């Protein structure tokens, strides 16, 4: 297979069998073994996130589960210090690329990784060769002791393949990124290794033209180094990491998981662009002055599920058709139908807005494709199928989601199921 066995772990010469939780509890460096010829000390456990777990969006946890995978590569020889990074959140179909020159302390790399809070970091095997470990690898493993590390052969950090991936997967709306990154070889190399690896662990491929690809420079944001963020308790309480007494905890009245993620990112990497800040302040001012708009938006937005995570699972095509994959498709269609049915209420709430940003949001909701997708869904899914909370009620919704006469075998199975349920109820 593309990636080798990752179940062994050697620490100080003695073999250990570790579960995910025990591996992450160690203070030793945990490195995933990919196709390496050497028998270097390794420890590896990954968590594929193909399903969409839905919780109430009105109560977003301040400490969400990490779901970001990052690939990091550094130049060699005279290019040492030039770092390329590529990251993807398994709950969000967006690839973020970065390339920058860093100093010998690698403060920029550490800060960017702290902001991303990765589930897993992918690096080249040459960065951690026995007796020849790079300073970057040593610093990252020192700062991220509870993060899984995985190494892949250097040949998979291929900038040509990275550009091909971006051309193939980047949605047409974001195609201007090609011009930004075509000469940035290290972030392209990181993108190639990252996307190949994610496809491997997810056992799926991304649909063509389905990802948002963005090059993230640091020109319009302030950099807060990781030690300052920790000392100021911006997102994590130093006494108790589960305690919400932080700047993030005080400000987090967001109604969706996506909003919570955006707030966290803005706290750790605040904007310095005056125009953008003033545009946002205009929105705040309008919401303060128009009570009906404020509560109307709040009511609609709180009904949304994790839209970014839903999009992420929708654009992944499973390599194998299984019963579980089929069930996931039905579940995701119900979630998508629920989301699309909220477009009109959201438009109605935004209709009377005056600020440019809120008007832009309203105009984006005018896109006719929302209606076309919903119409296609309703040709197969019953109109009265609804997203409901609770496993049992959702199971019932899934059983009767597909309209009759679409598949005769499904109709027979469903009729049998109904008869059995009725018989049980009559006992």
Could you describe each region identified by the protein language model?
Residues 1-289, 295, 301-312, 324-426:
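Charged catalytic and DNA/RNA-contacting regions of genome-maintenance
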Residues 318-321:
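Helix-rich, typically C-terminal accessory recognition domains appended to large enzymatic cores
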């Amino acid at each position: 297979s593309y990636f080798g066995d990752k179940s062994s772990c050697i620490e100080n010469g003695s073999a250990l069998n570790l579960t995910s939780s025990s591996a992450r509890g160690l203070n030793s460096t945990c490195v995933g073994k990919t196709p390496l010829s050497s028998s270097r000390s390794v420890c590896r456990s990954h968590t594929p996130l193909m399903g969409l777990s839905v919780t109430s969006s009105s109560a977003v946890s301040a400490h969400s589960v990490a779901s970001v995978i990052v690939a990091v590569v550094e130049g060699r020889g005279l290019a040492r210090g030039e770092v390329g990074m590529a990251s993807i959140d398994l709950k969000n179909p967006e690839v973020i690329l970065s390339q920058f020159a860093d100093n010998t302390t690698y403060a920029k790399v550490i800060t960017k990784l702290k902001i991303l809070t990765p589930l897993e970091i992918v690096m080249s095997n040459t960065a951690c060769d026995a007796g020849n470990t790079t300073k970057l690898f040593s610093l990252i493993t020192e700062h991220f002791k509870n993060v899984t590390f995985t190494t892949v052969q250097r040949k998979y950090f291929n900038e040509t393949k990275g550009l091909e991936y971006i051309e193939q997967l980047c949605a047409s709306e974001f195609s201007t990124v090609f011009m930004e990154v075509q000469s940035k070889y290290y972030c392209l190399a990181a993108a190639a290794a990252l996307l190949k690896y994610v496809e491997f662990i997810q056992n799926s491929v991304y649909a063509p033209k389905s990802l948002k690809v963005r090059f993230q420079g640091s020109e319009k944001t302030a950099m807060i180094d990781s030690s300052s963020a920790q000392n100021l308790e911006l997102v994590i309480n130093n006494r108790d990491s589960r305690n919400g007494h932080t700047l993030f905890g005080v400000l987090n009245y967001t109604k969706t998981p996506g909003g919570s993620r955006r707030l966290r990112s803005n706290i750790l990497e605040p904007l310095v662009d005056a125009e953008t800040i003033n545009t946002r302040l205009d929105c705040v001012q309008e919401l303060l002055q128009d009570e009906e708009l404020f509560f109307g938006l709040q009511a609609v937005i709180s009904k949304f599920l994790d839209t970014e995570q839903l999009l992420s699972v929708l654009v992944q095509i499973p390599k194998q058709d299984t019963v579980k994959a089929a069930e996931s498709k039905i579940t995701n269609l119900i979630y998508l139908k629920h989301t699309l049915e909220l477009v009109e209420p959201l438009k109605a709430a935004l209709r009377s807005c005056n600020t440019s940003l809120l008007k832009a949001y309203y105009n984006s909701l005018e896109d006719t494709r929302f209606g076309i997708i919903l119409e296609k869904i309703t040709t197969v899914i019953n109109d009265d199928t609804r997203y409901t909370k609770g496993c049992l009620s959702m199971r019932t919704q899934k059983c009767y989601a597909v309209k009759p006469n679409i598949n005769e075998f499904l109709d027979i199975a469903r009729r049998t199921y109904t008869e059995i349920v009725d018989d049980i109820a009559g006992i």
